């Protein structure tokens, strides 16, 4: 089943590690309690940040290949989060002061039931933090997160309607810079609901703007394909950095290929990207290049970190960035 053997490891990037520490600061604004549950805790990196701040840490994640790592310093159940799995926590009702779900909500086929399970394990004075990673998707012409693992996308208004049906309240909506800009919805069991003061952020989502967004996406894909194909036809080496799901989505939608892709995660090395069959190699491969190369940061939300890593290995580089528009950036 999906996510049982999961190759995405959140602790791979320094950008995320720093953000996880910052996220603890966000949580601390709302909660004095110190018992936290991380839903879809992956390798436990976010829980590490909570543990450093004195929290009692719990997690749940179905990835069997990551369980030894995530449970090393935390109480982690290897399972999907649902009404059956929460029974595995002792005294699960009203147990946790903090419940977090970062970039997992879109994976769920039953979001109302997901929230209702969160409500069961959340303490009466606690807060639930739902992070979604598409806050600037339309304004920045981002379409690389639209793929089979992401079942739904929520505006502030649609999230408000869903939250109400689950018997919860929106206390705050925070925009953070991570993953190309994300929303963090701060929810609780008690009112009042403060969502109305944030609804103006949805003003961009008009039918006209959405049609323009679709045209922009098609244009970016075509322009990127044209640039890369032209460079490769001239004999240049064009590689990708980051064998991320969003990068693979962009490649397959845009219909281009690359000489190879490098990734920081050893679990992906010497595999191939789905559909395009591009080899995935260790980052050190870049050191072996003896001529000018072009690098496409496929985890574009980590552009600055990727640029710094590549520059430390090879300075004879031009970067091809595609959001919000296509541009070539010299090292």
Model regions and ranges:
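A conserved beta-strand element that flanks and buttresses the S-adenosyl-L-methionine
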Residues: 100
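Conserved S-adenosyl-L-methionine
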Residues: 168-179
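Conserved beta-strand signature within the Rossmann-like core of class I S-adenosyl-L-methionine
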Residues: 125-133, 318-324
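Extended interfacial segments that mediate partner engagement and assembly in macromolecular machines
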Residues: 1-69, 142, 147, 152, ...
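Short, glycine-/aromatic-enriched active-site segment of Class I SAM-dependent methyltransferases
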Residues: 130-152, 156-158
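A short glycine-rich, Lys/Arg-flanked "PGG" loop and its adjoining helix->strand segment in the class I
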Residues: 112-127
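Conserved SAM-binding strand-loop segment of SAM-dependent methyltransferases
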Residues: 72-88, 280
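Hydrophobic, well-ordered beta-alpha structural blocks that scaffold small-molecule cofactor pockets
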Residues: 26-27, 33, 49, 188-331
